[in-house]
Structure formats: structure tokens, C-alpha cells
UniProtKB/Swiss-Prot annotation:
One of its GO terms (biological process) is chemotaxis. Its EC number is 3.5.1.44. The keyword Hydrolase applies. Probably deamidates glutamine residues to glutamate on methyl-accepting chemotaxis receptors (MCPs), playing an important role in chemotaxis. It comes from Methanococcus maripaludis (strain C7 / ATCC BAA-1331). Keywords: Chemotaxis, Hydrolase. The gene is cheD. SUPFAM superfamilies: CNF1/YfiH-like putative cysteine hydrolases. It catalyses: L-glutaminyl-[protein] + H2O = L-glutamyl-[protein] + NH4(+). This is Probable chemoreceptor glutamine deamidase CheD. Belongs to the CheD family. It comes from the Archaea.
Length: 154
């Protein structure tokens, strides 16, 4: 079964399931515990929420990661065994120098927040100007990244 994660949402599951999301300027924060075969994806839309009691914690990098870790530990994962992968953050719209590059800001915030909780980023597929679809296999933690006809495993 494939669990689809919508914008600003968080999805967690156990093997043999997989988790999928479609990304543009948003960033997927992907956490996986290889020993327990448990993983999750947060579909981060924006860098930071000033409200730590956010009702939609998956929407922001600073609230998504603690919530994702909490949900994974409830499924049996151990925080010290989690590895992180990141994907997305494309510059989807041509912008002038006065426009904020949301994709770039999402990348920076996601990396910062992953480091803050002491996790290592094992691999990433970030930036560019093309959207992508990612699929996390909970059997082995591999992430298939599809950009048009291009396929890549991170």
C-alpha cells in the first residue's frame, strides 16, 4: 500500500508500505529507522512557524521534525537510530532579485532543523527548477526521486 502525503502533512508507516509525496518548492523531510523498518515523511511548505503549538505541524520545518520524530517513536522507532534524507525545494517560478525564493528558504530551514535535533542527513536531492515525486520504501529506506523521465535513488 502507498500512503500519500499532502502538502503540509506528515505520514508515517511500517514496512512493507511505502510513502509518497509530490514536491515543488516544498521540502520532504524523510526519516527512517532501518532496524525497525519504520519511516515517515513531512511535506514542509514553509521554513518557520512562530507558533510552536501549530495546529498543522507538518507545514513548517521547525514544527514538522519534532512531530515526525514523535509519531515515529510511537510506531517503535528509536530517535538515535533515525537517518534523514531531504528532497525538493525547487525554484518553481522565475523570480527577480526582490522576490523570496521559498524553495531555498525551505532547504536552509529543513537542514538547520534536522541538525538541531542531532540527526545526520544521509542523502539529498534538493533545489533545481523542476518539481519531483518521491517514494520512500519502508522495506529498505530507499527513496525513489522522479523528475519527469529522470529516476534517481537517494
Amino acid at each position: 500500500m502507498v500512503l500519500k502525503v499532502k502538502m503540509g502533512d506528515i505520514g508515517v508507516a511500517k514496512s512493507p508500505e511505502s510513502i509518497e509525496t509530490l514536491l515543488g518548492s516544498c521540502v520532504a523531510i524523510i526519516l527512517y529507522d532501518r532496524g525497525k523498518k519504520v519511516g515517515g515523511v513531512a511535506h514542509v511548505m514553509l521554513p518557520k512557524s512562530r507558533n510552536t503549538a501549530e495546529r498543522t505541524p507538518g507545514k513548517y520545518a521547525n514544527t514538522a521534525i519534532p512531530e515526525l520524530i514523535d509519531r515515529l517513536t510511537k510506531l517503535g522507532a528509536r530517535k538515535d537510530k533515525l537517518t534523514a534524507k531531504l528532497a525538493g525545494g525547487a525554484a518553481m517560478f522565475k523570480c527577480n532579485s526582490n522576490t523570496i525564493d521559498v524553495g531555498k528558504k525551505n532547504i536552509e530551514a529543513s537542514k538547520e532543523e534536522v541538525r538541531k535535533v542531532g540527526l545526520r542527513i544521509a542523502s539529498e536531492d534538493l533545489g533545481g527548477d523542476t518539481g519531483r515525486t518521491i517514494t520512500l520504501s519502508l522495506k529498505d529506506g530507499s527513496v525513489l526521486v522522479r523528475k519527469g523521465a529522470e529516476l534517481k535513488v537517494i
